[in-house]
């Protein structure tokens, strides 16, 4: 992997970017004022939380066995190329801001601002949607909970306030919370994957057919086709560059490639394993709600383990 910086030395010791651009102030300021505390585990945990959204699984399973085809096709055509590009750019320019910094070097200030804004803005909306997901969990536990819109609104507001309070804590404390949340989420996904295996081992039939080639193929029919799943899969794989927005705070350049390698493997295995269990236990007609993954565990491993999965996913 190349690690050469695209800068030239000017008289007096300052550096200059190709085309006469001066380096961004953040390239020097961040490394001088913020401690390099992010290691491979920290960056991998952030990477996994950003990309491995278990909510994408119930949305993808209507494709049946073809969902695996789309997961693999999306990984080959989009996800892995993004990972390779992120590793290359991150190694060449290991600076704070990632996408903004890289776009600034290639296209200048206008387009770097545009790229950074459209990458940042969905994060604001994501805080709201996370509160809505929490509401979905509570309603899955008891259909009589949070039935009124104002009750749901209070939960969303509470999650937003809690997010703000967490954001003003010491960075190391926040990162430890991120690592813990990633661990809980992986525990939930591991139990979900185990549910599919136990379901088959205990003699239950698979709710989805995997035995015919037609089950795995892409269907282009406008009315009954599954081509739209490719968009769902592409959305699920977004975000490879997000952890490197903190690129000026990593302990060394080896963290860049290591967290991308391990994080990518965890994401791929997590999505495939979760999809397998939902398809085997509930089939492609599983409902589109997040709680369908919990129902999968309830059916195969019992309510107690299902409750553990609920707590694990709610921590995310």
Tell where the protein language model's regions lie, with residue ranges.
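Membrane-interface "cap" regions at the ends of multi-pass membrane proteins
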Residues: 1-73, 79-86, 211-217, 249
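Membrane-interface loop-to-helix entry segments
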Residues: 138, 151-208, 260-265
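TM-loop-TM module centered on a large, flexible mid-protein loop between adjacent transmembrane helices
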Residues: 101-102, 108, 140-145, 261-316
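Alpha-helical transmembrane segments of multipass membrane proteins
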Residues: 78-82, 192, 266-274
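Junctions where cytoplasmic loops transition into the N-terminal start of transmembrane alpha-helices
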Residues: 67, 71-72, 180-184, 243-279
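Hydrophobic transmembrane alpha-helices that form the core helical bundles
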Residues: 61-63, 80-160, 164-165, 307-315
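Helix-loop junctions at the membrane interface of multi-pass solute transporters
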Residues: 58-60, 88, 100, 104-105, ...
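Select transmembrane alpha-helical segments in multipass membrane proteins
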Residues: 35-47, 69, 108-121, 155-156, ...
